[in-house]
Swiss-Prot record:
GO biological process: one example: translation
Residues that, per the record, bind Zn(2+): 16, 18, 37, 40
Cofactor(s), by name: Zn(2+)
Oligomeric and partner information: Part of the 50S ribosomal subunit.
GO CC aspect terms: ribonucleoprotein complex; ribosome
Name of the protein described by the UniProt record: Large ribosomal subunit protein bL31
Taxonomic lineage of the native organism: Bacteria, Pseudomonadati, Pseudomonadota, Gammaproteobacteria, Oceanospirillales
Amino acid sequence: MKQGIHPEYKEITATCSCGNIIKTKSTLCENIHIDVCSSCHPFYTGKQKVLDTGGRIDRFKKRFGGRMGRSS
């Protein structure tokens, strides 16, 4: 490797809005604030919900009803 051409690679802390602090390494070289992490993200906590904006799921079920999965 050539000397002097690579960016600095330092340890930083990523602080989540839930209070969790994650130590990692980055070339950013400054501490960052994140909105969600694996401790509070619904996918990882098991509290995942389907958000139906505008009734799209109901509209789909009304339009296609029980036709899905049947072979003609």
